[in-house]
Amino acid sequence: GVILVAGAAVVKFLTAGLVYSAKDLKSTCNLPVLGTLASAAARKAVKLDAKLNKLEGRPDGSRDDETVRLIAATIASRAPKADRILVTGDLPAEQLSALTAQLQAADTLRSRKLTCAESVLVSSTAVLEVNAADAVVLVADCSCSRYSSVNDQKEQIARLGKTVLGCVVYE
């Protein structure tokens, strides 16, 4: 019985097409990963789940502040002349806003204007923001983002004449 339940869970996960890891997202969507941050679930994980996350090399939240500074420095070095940077993805607005605020607070991006917007696949405002941006950063969360959605966003941004600097992944 346990094997059937586990097997059904694996099949459901695979058919849902959810992003599994930053490494898989990089290879599947051909997107550079700017950094990985702990998802809400990873921060709450205890005992066996926390141990499994550690074995898989997933972040636990203890280094998120340093990782955000590293992501900000990477963005600044990849787009040295970008004054206006858009952070976008198919995440809840609060999560996008919080990440944008953290990046904006980093020394390397403090002098630049960072904005956030919903996915370009569902928001006309996001399309306008992409057009106004000098650089675009995608954000994905393993708990809700799908490979197809991330890839479609990347392609839509390219059709709008912009390139995606990379992706921040919540694991």
Report residues per predicted region.
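Short gly/ser/thr-rich secondary-structure transition/capping motifs
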Residues: A117-L121
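Inter-motif core of Ras-like GTPase G domains
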Residues: S123-C142
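Short boundary/hinge segments that flank catalytic cores
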Residues: G1-R112, V127, D141-E171
